[in-house]
C-alpha cells in the first residue's frame, strides 16, 4: 500500500510477506507476525495488522458473529479482529501490488495524546494475551507480544514527554509498573 503523510507526500510502505498464499498452520505464523516480531527482527511487529488492507469472507463473519470492535473499547482493534477472524479462515491470499492509499490522520485516536493510554495499552495486552493463550503455548507468543508491548510503552512515554507537564512523574510510574 501507499502511505500518504499529513503533508501529502506519498511513499510505498514496506511490506514483506514470505508467500502469497497462507493455509493451515501458516495462518498462525502470519497472525503471530501481526502480534509482534521475533526477538532478532528490527521492528516491533513483522506484519501490519490493519484491516483496511484486506477483504474478508462475509459467510465467515456471519457464521462466527465476528465484529469489529471500537477503538474506544480497545486500542488496536484490528489485531483483535484478526485474532477472531483468522481462527476461522482456511486461507489468506496476499496481493503483492499496492492497491490502497492510506492517509495519515494526526487527529486519530492513535496519534492523539491520551492520559489513559498506558492503562488502555495494559488492558489491550491482557486481552490479547488471554486470546493467544487459547491457541498457543506461552513460549510461542509471549516473546512477540512482550516485544510489541514494549514498543507501545515507548510510544506512551514519548507522548507523555511531548504533551504532559507532569511527564516525569507519569513516565516513572510507567517504568515502575510490574507489567513493564
What is the meaning of each model-derived region?
Residues 123-144:
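C-terminal, non-catalytic tails of nucleotide-sugar-dependent glycosyltransferases
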Residues 10-16, 130, 157-180:
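Membrane-interface aromatic/basic loop that binds lipid-linked glycans or pyrophosphate carriers
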Residues 143-158:
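Amphipathic alpha-helical repeat scaffolds of TPR domains
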Residues 112-119, 140, 144:
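A short glycine-/small-residue-rich loop at the edge of a beta-strand within enzyme catalytic domains
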Residues 1-93, 100-116:
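Donor-binding/catalytic cores of nucleotide-activated saccharide
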Amino acid at each position: 500500500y501507499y502511505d500518504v503523510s499529513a503533508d501529502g507526500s506519498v511513499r510505498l510502505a514496506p511490506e514483506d510477506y514470505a508467500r502469497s498464499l497462507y493455509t493451515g498452520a501458516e495462518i498462525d505464523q502470519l497472525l503471530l507476525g501481526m502480534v509482534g516480531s521475533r526477538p532478532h527482527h528490527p521492528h516491533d511487529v513483522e506484519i501490519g495488522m490493519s484491516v483496511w488492507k484486506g477483504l474478508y469472507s462475509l459467510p465467515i463473519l456471519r457464521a462466527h458473529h465476528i465484529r469489529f470492535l471500537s477503538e474506544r473499547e480497545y486500542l488496536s482493534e484490528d489485531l483483535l479482529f484478526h485474532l477472531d477472524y483468522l481462527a476461522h479462515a482456511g486461507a489468506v491470499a496476499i496481493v503483492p501490488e499496492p492497491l490502497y492509499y492510506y492517509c495519515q490522520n494526526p487527529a486519530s485516536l492513535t496519534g492523539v495524546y491520551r492520559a489513559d493510554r498506558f492503562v488502555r495499552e495494559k488492558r489491550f495486552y491482557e486481552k490479547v494475551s488471554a486470546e493467544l493463550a487459547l491457541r498457543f503455548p506461552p513460549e510461542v507468543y509471549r516473546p512477540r507480544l512482550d516485544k510489541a508491548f514494549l514498543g507501545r510503552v515507548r510510544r506512551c512515554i514519548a507522548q507523555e514527554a511531548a504533551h504532559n507537564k507532569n511527564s516525569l512523574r507519569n513516565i516513572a510510574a510507567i517504568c515502575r509498573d510490574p507489567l513493564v
